[in-house]
């Protein structure tokens, strides 16, 4: 009620705060937009699209700010990947799509949910926040499992740099926001059937339309439903995988200014039970590249359910109120032998016979109001809001994960899972979070805008550890509070060229916040800040665009070994990164479009030590593990004849280190992909996709201090038939 009263008071201020009727989901008509629009759109609009490079900077983005400004007017590095372009390239997973954006590299493994990436020198689910339609599921035990498939995606927006001021704790490196397709009034149904290498079979359905299409004055109730099923025998022994996603939305335009949308998404994944191969001295035998050292009855399963109720109401001219209530459930199960080490006699020792089950439930609500108007004659947009979350997490496992075996490198019987440790409930946690946030954009002049933001988070945490045959039950509670803020300037040098600078702060938990251990309970959140400057430009009347960003991030309060006492851990560590990122898109005559980007960074531990055999060893100056310092992407698309398109792409990921000591060096890699499509008729399109054309053996990520490498998929391909009705 207090929040509603606050919003009512904002409405009362409307008399003194000269307002204009503006959709908060559209850019403010600054110098950039003034040349493009003479009137403002209605409050309820369809989701913007960015299918061509020329549109990417001019359309509003929602991941770098809640202000609804365009990328050109946002003082941050934001990139939009259109869903149609993603699917045209054959990128069926969110990770495949996102790692074509500047600076993002794949770190996905079964242990992190198959969705982890790195960017700007940071890696892990805690440091790169994943959103679904702007909503975050809190990270439990370093794992995020949804969203994962691109079939239902309208677009993916990525932000590079800290985002705590927008989404709370986490996101020191960046944000991935997966935005699903919305219901449309025009009826359309799409069916996809596909087959591919290694026994892949894919089926997908997407349908949308109006329930009351014949209603005089236009429909009020629209729907969207999707279904996707993908199964594969895998490229290595016991490599089967199967995923299913189903969901939809109902959208009610109750009045011209009031909209309700109810969304539900269900996903089931049974990914490949593969944890890589053992290596020594940064090398491995080529004979091991298609070996799977997991047990024969290994099992991994993820189940996710998301329900969201969204309300958008233009309460007054210039005042729009939005609310989203959400309920999410996730259940996960691992049943594996996950660690492998080469022995002196050439055999492979397997350990960590792990069985873990996660049950996570999250209920939350986000309410915000956007007020457009003028302050002393200057155009201003102001957002204020609150967010509440309650998260319950239960961990069941067979800790301390007893079980081991030794097998030959080749021609072995994989055996079955065997551990003397019982699988029992280990702990449960409850996390309650409350936040208040605000953003503001003031046009100081017709060409200069000041953008600022502030967020305060309060988190109450409790963990109950259950009693076992050898340990007593324990409990502890902890409270965290953090304030994040940012300030930035955007200067429009011309209507299509802007330069910007910003300073922002952020925070990360010491590990996953909702599964914080008692050993780490005394520590505060890790904090950080970023300086960033950049330039963005649209060229040739919209046929080309490019961006350039320079940044430096410093993250403090890392856990590090006490240099005077190797048995103690203290929170004084520091990690930093600085770098440059460039993106560009060019539309040429004869149907040729080129998208390209590159990133170069320097990431280092500035103050970080570890205990090695009871001795404190400094890692100062070393590169954080699993962080490539160079990445690059190019994709060329050519519509060489009516209905015909071909595409080709190259992806480069620089070398990385697999350990904090920087003794294990993981090689760089270059991958080549290609696609071709033919629209046979208005109702039918055929497509061919080829991946890793040179059959390059490459490392996706590493574990166990770099002695275990997870290899990527060899050369593969597939064909699809897409029917539209």
Task: Report the location of each language-model feature.
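Structural signature of Gram-negative outer-membrane beta-barrels, strongest in the C-terminal barrel
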Residues: 251-255, 360, 379-381, 387-389, ...
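Gram-negative outer-membrane beta-barrel transporters
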Residues: 552, 571-660, 694, 724
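N-terminal periplasmic accessory domains that precede
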Residues: 94-97, 115-118, 170-192, 203-209
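C-terminal beta-signal and adjacent terminal beta-strands/loops
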Residues: 594, 652-659, 677-725
């Amino acid at each position: 009620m207090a929040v509603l009263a606050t919003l009512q008071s904002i409405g009362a201020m409307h008399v003194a705060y000269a307002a204009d009727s503006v959709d908060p989901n559209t850019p403010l008509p600054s110098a950039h937009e003034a040349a493009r629009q003479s009137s403002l759109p209605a409050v309820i609009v369809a989701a913007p699209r960015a299918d061509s490079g020329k549109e990417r900077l001019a359309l509003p983005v929602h991941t770098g700010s809640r202000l609804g400004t365009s990328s050109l007017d946002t003082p941050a590095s934001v990139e939009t990947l259109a869903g149609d372009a993603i699917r045209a390239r054959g990128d069926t997973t969110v990770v495949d799509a996102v790692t074509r954006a500047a600076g993002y590299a794949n770190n996905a493994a079964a242990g992190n949910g198959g969705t982890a990436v790195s960017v700007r020198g940071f890696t892990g689910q805690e440091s790169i926040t994943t959103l679904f339609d702007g909503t975050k599921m809190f990270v439990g035990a370093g794992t995020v499992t949804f969203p994962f498939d691109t079939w239902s995606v309208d677009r993916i927006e990525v932000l590079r740099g800290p985002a705590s001021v927008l989404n709370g704790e986490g996101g020191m490196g960046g944000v991935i926001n997966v935005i699903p397709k919305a219901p449309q009034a025009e009826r359309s149904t799409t069916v996809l059937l596909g087959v591919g290498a290694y026994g892949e079979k894919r089926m997908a359905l997407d349908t949308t339309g109006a329930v009351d299409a014949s209603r005089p004055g236009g429909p009020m109730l629209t729907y969207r439903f999707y279904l996707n099923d993908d199964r594969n025998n895998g490229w290595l022994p016991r490599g089967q995988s199967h995923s299913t996603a189903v969901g939809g939305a109902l959208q009610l335009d109750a009045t011209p200014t009031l909209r309700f949308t109810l969304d539900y998404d269900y996903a089931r994944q049974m990914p490949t039970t593969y944890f890589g191969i053992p290596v020594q001295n940064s090398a491995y035998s080529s004979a091991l590249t298609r070996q799977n050292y997991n047990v024969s009855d290994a099992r991994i399963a993820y189940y996710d359910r998301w329900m969201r109720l969204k309300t958008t109401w233009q309460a007054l001219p210039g005042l729009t109120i939005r609310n989203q209530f959400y309920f999410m459930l996730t259940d996960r199960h691992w049943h594996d032998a996950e660690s492998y080490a080469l022995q002196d006699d050439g055999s492979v020792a397997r350990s960590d016979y792990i069985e873990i089950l996660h049950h996570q439930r999250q209920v939350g609500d986000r309410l915000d109001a956007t007020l457009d108007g003028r302050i002393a004659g200057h155009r201003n947009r102001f957002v204020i809001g609150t967010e509440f979350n309650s998260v319950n997490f239960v961990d069941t496992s067979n800790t301390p994960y007893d079980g081991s075996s030794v097998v030959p490198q080749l021609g072995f019987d994989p055996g079955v899972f065997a551990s003397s440790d019982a699988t029992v409930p280990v702990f449960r946690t409850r996390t309650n979070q409350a936040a208040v946030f605000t953003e503001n954009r003031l046009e100081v002049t017709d060409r200069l805008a000041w953008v600022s933001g502030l967020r305060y988070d309060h988190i109450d945490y409790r963990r109950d550890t259950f009693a076992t045959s050898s340990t007593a039950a324990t409990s502890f509670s902890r409270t965290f509070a953090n304030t994040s803020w940012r300030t930035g300037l955007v200067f429009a040098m011309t209507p299509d060229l802007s330069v910007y600078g910003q300073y922002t702060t952020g925070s990360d938990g010491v590990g996953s916040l909702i599964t914080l251990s008692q050993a780490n309970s005394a520590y505060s959140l890790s904090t950080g800040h970023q300086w960033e400057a950049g330039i963005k430009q649209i060229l040739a009347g919209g046929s080309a665009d490019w961006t350039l960003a320079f940044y430096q991030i410093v993250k403090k309060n890392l856990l590090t070994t006490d240099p005077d006492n190797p048995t103690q851990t203290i929170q004084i560590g520091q990690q930093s990164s600085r770098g440059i990122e460039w993106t560009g898109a060019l539309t040429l005559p004869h149907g040729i479009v080129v998208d390209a980007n590159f990133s170069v960074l320097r990431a280092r531990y500035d103050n970080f030590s570890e205990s090695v055999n009871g001795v404190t060893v400094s890692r100062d100056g070393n590169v954080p593990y699993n962080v490539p310092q160079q990445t690059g992407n190019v994709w060329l698309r050519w519509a060489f004849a009516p209905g015909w398109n071909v595409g080709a792409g190259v992806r480069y990921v620089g070398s990385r280190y697999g350990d904090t000591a920087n003794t294990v060096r993981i090689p760089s890699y270059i991958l080549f992909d290609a696609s071709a499509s033919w629209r046979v008729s208005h109702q039918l399109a055929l497509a061919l996709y080829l991946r890793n054309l040179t059959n390059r053996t490459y490392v996706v990520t590493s574990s166990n201090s770099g002695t275990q490498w997870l290899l990527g998929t060899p050369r593969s391909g597939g064909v699809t038939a897409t029917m539209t009705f």
